[in-house]
Each structure stands twice: as structure tokens, then as C-alpha cells.
């Protein structure tokens, strides 16, 4: 079983913020596929999807970004998901808006959601799909990430949403992650 984790913050005031790109991606993927709601409550939203006998879970932790690892750990323990079968979708201020980067593993890069996942799982060995949100040096970082973006920026950040959905589909279908990285990192 695969686990796709879209990082973000719960609540309508965060919907169109840079920090909620992970939630937006999960929502986009679900809107294009048949899925089953397993749970939607104050701690997590869990969705199940099946493609050709490949069962996967997509989740949106509802504990706020900085506590995402609590939910991820609970789910991997409950469903016995291996670390190598986890893909975390996360915003990245060091990438230009809309730029994508797949990583096999790595540190948190200052991202508190990733930091909490690493801390709770005790490993950096999970896969990531980073989506560029750029950085505005004129604004405090938390304000920049948590302020709703205009329609133009939102469109630019998610300009590769069809490619992102293909990456998720291929990940679920067990396409080798090195092939995905080689195929998509060089193009995007």
C-alpha cells in the first residue's frame, strides 16, 4: 500500500495559501479519480483509491503543518505502510513558483511540516514531491506562506498540476522512483 501525504493547514483561511499546496494537490488528484472517504475529522482526512489492484491512501493531516508527523506516524502504524511507500507533497520556498522536484529522501530544509514528520518517524528516508512557491524577501516568511495568493500566483504555482497528477498515478502504480526522478526532474 502507498501513502500520499499532502501537507497543509486546516480551515478556510488557509485554502489558497502557499503552505497549502499539498492539500490542493490531493484535492486535484481526488477530483479526477474515484475514491472512498475513510475518515474526515479534526485530526485527518483519509481517502482510499484503487488502480489495477494497487491500493493507496491519500491524506491531509488536520493537525496543522507543524504536527503533521503525528498523523503520518499513526497512519503508517495502523495500515502497516513501509517508509519507502510514502510520498509527501510539500511547498518549497527555494524553488521558483510551479517548479517541481522529486526527491528520494533528504532533510527538512527548514520546513516545519517535514521536520515533524522526520522527527516522528525517526527517518529521512521517505520520498518527496516539492512544489515551488518561491520566496519574497520583503515579507516575513510565515506571513508570506500563510497569506492567500492572488489568482495569477495560484495558477503559476499549480501550472504543472496535470504532471503532478501523473507523478502520483505512476507512484501508486509502482513505477520506479528513480525513473520518475530522471523523467521529471530534468524537464521541470
Curated annotation (Swiss-Prot):
Gene symbol here is pth
* Function, in words: Hydrolyzes ribosome-free peptidyl-tRNAs (with 1 or more amino acids incorporated), which drop off the ribosome during protein synthesis, or as a result of ribosome stalling.
A GO BP annotation: rescue of stalled ribosome
What are the record's GO terms for cellular component?
cytoplasm
Where, per UniProt, does this protein localize? Cytoplasm
**PROSITE patterns according to UniProt:** PEPT_TRNA_HYDROL_1 (PS01195), PEPT_TRNA_HYDROL_2 (PS01196)
Q: Reply yes or no: does the keyword Translocase apply.
A: no
Residues bound to tRNA are: 14, 64, 66, 112
Q: InterPro entries given for it?
A: Pept_tRNA_hydro, Pept_tRNA_hydro_CS, Pept_tRNA_hydro_sf
What protein name does the entry list?
Peptidyl-tRNA hydrolase
- The positions annotated as site (Stabilizes the basic form of H active site to accept a proton) read 91
Indicate where this protein is primarily found: cytoplasm
The record's section on Gene3D superfamilies has: Peptidyl-tRNA hydrolase
Q: Which GO terms describe its molecular function?
A: peptidyl-tRNA hydrolase activity; tRNA binding
UniProt key word Cytoplasm: yes
Q: Which CDD domains match?
A: PTH
In short, the EC number is 3.1.1.29
How it assembles, according to the record, is: Monomer.
What NCBIfam families does the database record attribute to this sequence? Answer: pth (TIGR00447)
What are the entry keywords?
Answer: Cytoplasm, Hydrolase, RNA-binding, tRNA-binding
* Catalytic activity of the protein: an N-acyl-L-alpha-aminoacyl-tRNA + H2O = an N-acyl-L-amino acid + a tRNA + H(+)
**Annotated TM spans:** none
Secretion signal: which residues? none
Domain of life according to the entry: Bacteria
Amino acid at each position: 500500500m502507498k501513502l500520499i501525504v499532502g501537507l497543509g493547514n486546516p480551515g478556510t483561511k488557509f485554502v489558497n495559501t502557499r503552505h497549502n499546496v499539498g492539500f490542493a494537490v490531493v484535492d486535484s488528484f481526488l477530483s479526477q479519480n474515484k475514491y472512498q472517504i475513510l475518515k474526515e475529522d479534526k485530526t485527518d482526512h483519509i481517502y482510499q483509491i484503487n488502480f489495477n489492484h494497487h491500493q493507496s491512501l491519500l491524506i491531509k493531516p488536520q493537525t496543522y503543518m507543524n504536527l503533521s508527523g503525528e498523523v503520518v506516524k499513526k497512519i503508517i502504524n495502523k495500515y502497516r505502510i513501509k517508509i519507502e511507500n510514502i510520498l509527501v507533497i510539500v511547498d518549497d520556498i527555494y524553488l521558483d513558483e510551479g517548479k517541481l522536484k522529486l526527491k528520494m529522501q533528504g532533510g527538512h530544509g527548514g520546513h516545519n511540516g517535514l521536520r515533524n514528520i522526520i522527527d516522528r518517524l525517526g527517518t529521512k528516508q521517505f520520498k518527496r514531491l516539492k512544489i515551488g512557491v518561491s520566496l519574497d524577501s520583503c515579507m516575513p516568511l510565515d506571513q508570506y506562506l500563510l497569506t492567500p495568493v492572488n489568482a495569477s500566483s495560484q495558477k503559476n504555482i499549480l501550472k504543472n498540476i496535470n504532471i503532478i497528477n501523473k507523478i502520483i498515478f505512476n507512484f501508486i502504480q509502482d513505477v520506479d522512483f528513480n525513473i520518475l526522478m530522471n523523467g521529471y526532474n530534468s524537464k521541470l
